[in-house]
Regions:
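Extreme N-terminal basic, low-complexity initiation segments
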Residues: 1-13
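Intrinsic disorder/low-complexity segments in short proteins, especially the signal peptide
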Residues: 6-7, 18, 32, 37, ...
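N-terminal hydrophobic alpha-helix used for membrane targeting or insertion
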Residues: 10, 14-17, 158
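Cysteine-centered motifs
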Residues: 23, 30-33
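Structural preference for solvent-exposed beta-strand-turn elements
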Residues: 28-31, 47-51, 55-440
Length: 440
């Protein structure tokens, strides 16, 4: 119930009140809508549902509450497209429009867009459109409805009239979804991107897969909450390098510099963006177009366009923690080492996960002692010619790094029990890992 501060025409804008009836006039036709009629103080009135939709849908600004569209699309195509965009939408939103996906139909194409204000994903698919139109609907509900429809379904999306709902039909199933106007939907993709280049999806996938595990989840050090992507070396012989670290371990992977990337600034791509890009290039097929500025990055993968803000911070001078004088080389069979670490760590404490490596000659003994649950030891054959050494590591971190080694042999370059260890694949170049030791 609202208290008016001036005279109101009978039923204006869907108002019921002193006249006991709703307005029969079309919206925008009365003095109240036009803003020319004064309002008498103390008059109580109620706004009808239609009036509320008009009021809060931006009717005073001339925004159109109604929308008309009709789209026919294959269920499999719509589900795949929704799968690309709906993950961006947070489950809990204080801003209603951010819980929605923008649905836009025009000229034989259906476009879907979702955003969380930091990340935006757009996808488009072929569809029968007559007429075109646009609106927004709840993203996760829309996805779940389409997912649960039978395979092979033809889906019809239709909006018309002033009900502000999108109707969905497939076979004998009927749904209606509440909508919010397109005019409320934010556009993150706007703005110029000063640098652009292309690279194979397989190369981008390698950069991400081999560094993502080391991204920090500690929000206080926000500048570590992503992958640092930058040019290393000279423009002629440089590389595109990806680095991630959480302060306990560091991953660095590089590949030949793509054409056009030489002048790009160093950027930090957020963890959520990295995860979404990783899903989109899961097959590693085709090329990816990359555009970026100092504040945003855009990936175009087929029909999918992902635009993201970058982390506004300075990545630390990671080169200082990469050891260059470690002269104790421990050469291990990757599978044997990984399996042994996994077995003995079964009894480690959930908090510490410490595993001790005792190295003498051609023998490595891995041991774990947990006062609360027990102990474990295992011995494997290795290649090691330096002085005997005892050193401890977090077993989970060791396993994370071992999982990135593609070849049969891993090399651990050691110094002493208190210094970082450099780990590399003996057969593959372009990737290295640094792991800080722990007391055992």
């Amino acid at each position: 119930v609202f208290a008016a501060t001036g005279p109101v025409e009978a039923g204006a804008l869907g108002i019921e009140g002193a006249w006991g009836k709703a307005c029969a006039k079309p919206l925008h036709s009365c003095d109240f809508c036009a803003g020319t009629s004064p309002l008498p103080s103390g008059l109580a009135f109620r706004v009808t549902p239609a009036g509320r939709r008009a009021w809060f849908g931006g009717i005073f600004k001339g925004a159109e509450a109604d929308f008309s569209m009709k789209v026919t699309v294959e269920r499999a195509e719509l589900l795949k497209s929704l799968g690309h965009v709906h993950r961006v939408v947070e489950r809990r939103n204080t801003i209603p429009i951010l819980a929605n996906v923008l649905v836009k139909a025009d000229r034989g194409k259906l476009s879907l867009k979702a955003t969380d204000l930091d990340l935006e994903v757009t996808d488009s698919i072929a569809a029968e459109v007559s007429p075109g139109g646009s609106t927004t609907v709840p993203a996760h509900m829309f996805y779940e409805i389409v997912r649960k429809l039978p395979e092979g379904s033809q889906i019809v999306l239709e909006g018309s009239g002033d009900r502000a709902v999108l109707a969905l039909r497939a076979g004998r199933s009927r749904f209606t979804l509440q909508t919010l106007p397109e005019s409320d939907f934010p556009d993150l993709a706007a703005g110029e991107m000063g640098h652009s280049f292309k690279l194979a999806a397989a190369d981008l996938k390698r950069l991400i897969d081999k560094t993502q595990f080391a991204i920090s989840t500690e929000e206080t050090r926000y500048y570590l909450n992503g992958i640092y992507l930058h040019v290393a070396g000279t423009p002629k012989s440089g590389t595109l390098r990806a680095v991630a670290t959480d302060g306990h371990r560091l991953a660095q992977v590089e590949l030949p510099l793509p054409q056009g990337a030489a002048g790009m600034p160093g950027i930090i791509v957020p963890r959520k963006t990295v995860g979404e890009v990783q899903r989109l290039i899961e097959t590693g097929e085709g090329d990816v177009a990359v555009e970026l500025s100092s504040a945003k990055i855009r990936f175009t993968i087929g029909n999918v366009v992902l635009t993201s803000k970058l982390i506004d911070g300075t990545f630390p001078d990671y080169a200082r923690v990469i050891p260059v004088n470690n002269d104790k080389n421990l050469v291990v069979d990757k599978k044997d080492f990984e399996a042994a670490v996994d077995r003995v760590s079964t009894v480690s404490s959930e908090r510490g996960r410490a595993v001790k490596l005792s190295i003498t000659g051609g023998r490595l003994v891995l041991s774990v002692t947990n006062p609360d649950s027990g102990s474990a030891t295992e011995e494997i054959e290795v290649d090691y010619a330096a002085d005997p050494l005892d050193i401890g590591f977090n077993s989970r971190y060791l396993l994370d790094i071992a999982a990135q080694i593609e070849g049969e042999v891993a090399v651990l370059k050691l110094a002493d029990p208190g210094s970082p260890t450099l780990i590399q694949d003996q057969d593959a170049k372009g990737a290295l890992y640094v792991l800080m030791p722990m007391r055992v």
